[in-house]
Amino acid sequence: MSILFTTLMLLIPIFLILIKRKRSAKKLPPGSLGLPIIGQSLSLLRAMRANTAEKWLEKRIKKYGPISKLSLFGNPTVFLHGPAANKFIFTSSCSIITNQQVKSIQMVLGDRSLLELTGDDHKRVRNALMLFLRPESLKDCVGKLEEEIRWHLEMHWQGKQQVTVLPLMKTLTFNIISSLLFGIQRGSQRDKLVGLFRQMMGGMWSVPLNFPFTRYRRSLQASKLAQNMLRQLISEKRVDLEQKGASPHQDLITCLLSIRNDNNEEMITEEEMVHNVLLVMTAGHDTSSVLITFMLQFLSNEPAVYENVLQEQENIARTKEAGMFLTWEDLSKMKYTWRVAMETLRMIPPIFGSFRKALKDIEYGGYLIPKGWQIFWASPMTHMDNNIYPEPTKFDPNRFENQASVPPCSFVGFGGGPRMCPGIEFARIETLITIHYLVTRFTWKLCADSTFSRDPMPVPAQGLPLQINQKNPL
């Protein structure tokens, strides 16, 4: 027995050395991890705020190729570039790559959101969200959404000579989310939540240093207060559902509360509801407001595109009597307008990039991606690739006339694979109805140049001020 034990004790170190040598024989990607914790985080954030992040990554690609190592937001990271890399990231098994975000995003939004869940938990929560966000359910929301948009235009656009678009679109999209998804009516509760939410967003992409007066600390504090508000709202919705006969379809939170398992227990935990409500707020508020804002900018700069959108929307408006709401069929006719939205997303994607995490050592492109490292991809790098989209700086909605002609995994405005954004249809409806009323009721001219920065979302110069004139009804 002692001989066997001694032999094993001698063999184990040899075995470990062989494993280490085998792993070290695989090359890490070229590049540098930079300074501890900080790495290249500040450099990338500066480039995003100066609207040079694409050039920042292009320099890396020219220097190191499509695979390189760096350190972002406190973690060693591998940057991957190209449609093949996108496909690898989007379609790899969750046992190989998981959808873990950087620490700052994880801590602000919570660890039970779709951004963090994997496997059966991800499927369960995503399916629950899709019960409300699928087209069949959203058809019943068109009128309610349209009411919010009409009210917004009456309050903030009519009678004005100049407006600043981005803050107004943020107000509009937050009100739509509050009403349709959370059932929060206009008033002090909505106003308090939007203030917390905006403060929360400020530190989501930041170095996770939890010190006083940092953006990250303020973001964490706002997230905690917002989560407490949402827990109170969930309790009220639970009472309405169980004791007052509220409809399960009246808003997203009530819908989630109504989903039961075989033991008649809530399918989604309260923590999952809170974290995913924060995620929906983030995804639905900032991304949609940015998309609509930059659509108006491109329509200002592209007269031929504007005329095509105007004609499409006026043709629909002429079929309506005064006060009539749009229908699902009307939205299905707005094909060119949606192509304009897709081209806007291609040229200025609201989400610059995202992260995954390697759950085991991965060999890709001849290099080792070590277990535990982040994997980073950036959507503009394929969106603006001349080999994929000829004349990529030209605004051309007809690129999306035939979806089959778009190379797989090259347009990633909504992500891809099983983790594609579940709110695509909601974003489409919100965008189309808003653009319909803007182009049929107003004309506008830009008051500032067309530059923008990222912080981390794209922000146009001065928030995109417009000089507007109200049109006569058709």
Residue ranges: model-predicted function:
Residues I3, T7-L16, P29-S32, I61, ...:
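Cytochrome P450 proximal C-terminal region
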Residues K27-P30, R134-D140, E242-A246, W328-K335, ...:
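Conserved, non-catalytic sequence blocks in retroelement Pol enzymes and Pol-derived host proteins
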Residues L44-E58, K63-G65, L225-Q232, G323-G365, ...:
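Conserved cytochrome P450 K-helix E-x-x-R motif and the immediately C-terminal K′/meander segment
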Residues T98-Q106, L117, D121, S137-V290, ...:
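Cytochrome P450 heme-thiolate monooxygenase catalytic core
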Residues W377-A404:
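Conserved cytochrome P450 K-helix/beta-meander segment immediately N-terminal to the heme-binding cysteine loop
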